[in-house]
């Protein structure tokens, strides 16, 4: 048997036990829901395109005059940056991604707005979605290609996937909130 606690001690113990800032915060559930939605949608679309429709065998599909479905295997990070052909490079990228997810989770447990929690959750969901690809296939499956072609010029955006889009939307959400949202900090007035 352990020591007997007074009523006040029991209350303090239960409060301390429920406050786990590195695991769960005020809006962590909302961020987790956003991240899971991004992850599940990303993986479902990739699985359907790879194994249901078989985009690799069928080839590019012109969905609209400015949007195609194509299959590109990305061995780098978002938008094809830092391509890694070696297994060591792939594992280094995976390790960095895991570290980023852990740090983002800790950040998400500490935010005080729903907007930030959802934004960070989208980034985490996108990062995990691409990490699953890297583990399963050795590269990330990218498939969305926006482009504009006229008689004079052609604009072609990077090929990306829904995980990349979730990361970009999450970063944009954090930037928006840092610039326009949250509580305004006013400088103290000088003088009497």
Model-inferred region functions:
Residues 1-2, 7-8:
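A cross-taxon signal for low-complexity, glycine/charged-rich
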Residues 8-192:
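Alpha-helical transmembrane bundles and membrane-interface segments of multipass inner-membrane proteins
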């Amino acid at each position: 048997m352990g020591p007997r606690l007074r009523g006040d001690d029991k209350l303090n113990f239960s409060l301390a036990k429920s406050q786990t800032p590195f695991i769960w915060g005020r809006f962590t559930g909302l961020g987790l829901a956003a991240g899971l939605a991004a992850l599940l949608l990303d993986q479902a679309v990739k699985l359907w395109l790879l194994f249901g429709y078989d985009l690799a065998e069928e080839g590019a599909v012109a969905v609209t005059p400015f949007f195609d479905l194509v299959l590109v295997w990305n061995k780098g990070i978002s938008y094809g940056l830092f391509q890694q052909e070696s297994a060591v490079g792939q594992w280094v990228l995976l390790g960095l991604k895991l570290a980023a997810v852990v740090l983002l989770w800790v950040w998400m447990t500490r935010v005080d707005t729903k907007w930030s929690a959802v934004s960070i959750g989208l980034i985490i969901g996108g990062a995990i979605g691409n990490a699953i690809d890297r583990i399963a296939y050795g590269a990330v499956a990218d498939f969305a290609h926006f482009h504009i072609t006229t008689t004079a010029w052609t604009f072609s955006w990077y090929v990306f996937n829904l995980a990349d889009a979730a990361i970009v939307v999450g970063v944009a959400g954090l930037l928006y909130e840092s610039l326009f949202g949250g509580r305004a900090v006013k400088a103290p007035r000088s003088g009497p």
